[in-house]
Amino acid sequence: MAPKKRPETQKTSEIVLRPRNKRSRSPLELEPEAKKLCAKGSGPSRRCDSDCLWVGLAGPQILPPCRSIVRTLHQHKLGRASWPSVQQGLQQSFLHTLDSYRILQKAAPFDRRATSLAWHPTHPSTVAVGSKGGDIMLWNFGIKDKPTFIKGIGAGGSITGLKFNPLNTNQFYASSMEGTTRLQDFKGNILRVFASSDTINIWFCSLDVSASSRMVVTGDNVGNVILLNMDGKELWNLRMHKKKVTHVALNPCCDWFLATASVDQTVKIWDLRQVRGKASFLYSLPHRHPVNAACFSPDGARLLTTDQKSEIRVYSASQWDCPLGLIPHPHRHFQHLTPIKAAWHPRYNLIVVGRYPDPNFKSCTPYELRTIDVFDGNSGKMMCQLYDPESSGISSLNEFNPMGDTLASAMGYHILIWSQEEARTRK
């Protein structure tokens, strides 16, 4: 399809950047004046239906004293410490730094809520964000220039998936309720339409891209999944789920491995080389509720799923059909809230997810804070909570940049950038 121009590409004048002047406090520091409203204690102690090996704890854990990383590395060099112990030491050190994370900058560029978020793969201070109105912002918060802003169509243009083009990071892939999955640049030019529904009743809800296999995969609201190459050639278009495909994920270490999540309460794992129809999946992972997301870990060995109620599950490659563990966590679905999705940390075995307090949740306390929760991916224990009393909304999307030292959060109309307090001082 011939390239065409998107309307109203501009430098936005609606960005509000807010450097933090006074130190915001952690949920634990707020407990005395909030009558200890933060979640405490353990969550449900029951085993999940499929005999998972552990059930995560709802309350934050007390971190052990941080060991010397230099000493641990020296012990490893001498053969006295295993590499997993080195990794554990690095993770423990990072968790201690999370206590000093504060909001570095804040932007409110959209007139509708943020719906998708993607970090630039090589620039650790650049993030792209899409909105319910189809607007897209490219924001380098490390410089004072105004972000680049691409105006959307408004109602019905929601950006449901956003990925930088791994072969040319001046371009990005986007799936939308407008009825297309497309490749475009940040000047507003549509370079190629990969999928188009040609009807207002069908739209695209999910997207993923693989640089090594040069594949693009996208899912729609009636259960179809389309696989294409980067030249736009359709390889297959099959109905893989009974209902909306909320998430598609290509395994980062095994290109032919695909996970799909749906509101039909299943996550399915596929071998792209053997897909013949909806019954040709390798594994079907049933859930109690519709599923918002299914994400592979950076090493490809684990799968993280988020339902629309109160469960986060971790599956392992050693046994895909049975969850390794279950984390009870309140993040229920609400029509006017961007679906909450848990995400992996890019370097450590940690899970980050926004909390939507639920009075019906077993461990809920009155006036529970809307925190960003960080869990250990091995044990399911909550390790840390981030909270700013001046930005106390629900953070639906939370993702660390590829370096793992900066967190971006989508909270309603706002985009929050979290980093160490010392980083703000240096700026």
From Swiss-Prot:
WD repeats lie at residues 116-151, 159-194, 203-238, 244-287, 290-329, 343-386, 396-420. Changing D264A: Impairs interaction with DDB1. The modification Phosphoserine is found at S24, S26. Induction: Expression is induced in response to treatment with IR or UV and this requires p53/TP53 activity. GO terms for biological process: cellular response to UV; DNA damage response; DNA repair; nucleotide-excision repair; protein autoubiquitination; protein polyubiquitination; pyrimidine dimer repair; response to UV. Residues 68-79, 87-98 are annotated as: Required for interaction with DDB1. Residues 1-30 are annotated as: Disordered. One of its GO terms (molecular function) is DNA binding. Pathway: Protein modification; protein ubiquitination. Phosphorylation by ABL1 negatively regulate UV-DDB activity. The DWD box is required for interaction with DDB1. Interblade loops of the WD repeat region mediate most of the interaction with DNA. A hairpin between blades 5 and 6 inserts into DNA minor groove and mediates recognition of lesions and separation of the damaged and undamaged strands. Belongs to the WD repeat DDB2/WDR76 family. This is DNA damage-binding protein 2. It comes from Homo sapiens (Human).
